[in-house]
Amino acid sequence: MNRAETGHRGEAAAARWYQKQGCRLLAHNFHTRMGELDVVVQEPDGTIVICEVKTRSSDAVSRPAAAVNAAKQKRLILAAQHYLQCTGQSDAPVRFDVAEVFPDRKSVV
């Protein structure tokens, strides 16, 4: 399995996890000039969750979330602002998550 396939499977696993928690999937791989939003869901209380998904093997040297540095966070914020404006949800409460997916452990953290 190549990196793109691994990433897509991780994103699908994260989306399924959120849906099992009662969230509604709003977008998957939403592309903007500023970057891509991996998974966007809405919690039952209306909160929009922007989720950056990082998929790694369990023998990775560092935690997957460590890859979401300040520059990546800035791009995510800009992409999220664009998404919220495009969908008319600029006033909704928003939360940013990082999902760590470990396919060989079959887990989402």
Language model segments and positions:
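Acidic-basic catalytic patches of nuclease active cores, encompassing PD-(D/E)XK
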Residues: M1-H28
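Conserved catalytic cores of phosphodiester-cleaving nucleases, focusing on short active-site segments
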Residues: Y18, L37-A60, V68, L76
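Short beta-strand or tight-loop elements
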Residues: G22, R33-L37, V94
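Hydrophobic "anchor" residues on beta-strands that sit immediately upstream
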Residues: R24, I48-I50, P93
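Short, solvent-exposed loop/turn elements at beta->coil junctions and helix N-caps
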Residues: A27-H31, A99-F102
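Acidic surface patches and DE-rich sequence motifs
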Residues: T32, E43, D104
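Catalytic cores of nucleic-acid endonucleases
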Residues: T55-D104
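Conserved small/polar residues in nucleotide/adenosyl-binding loops
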Residues: V108-V109
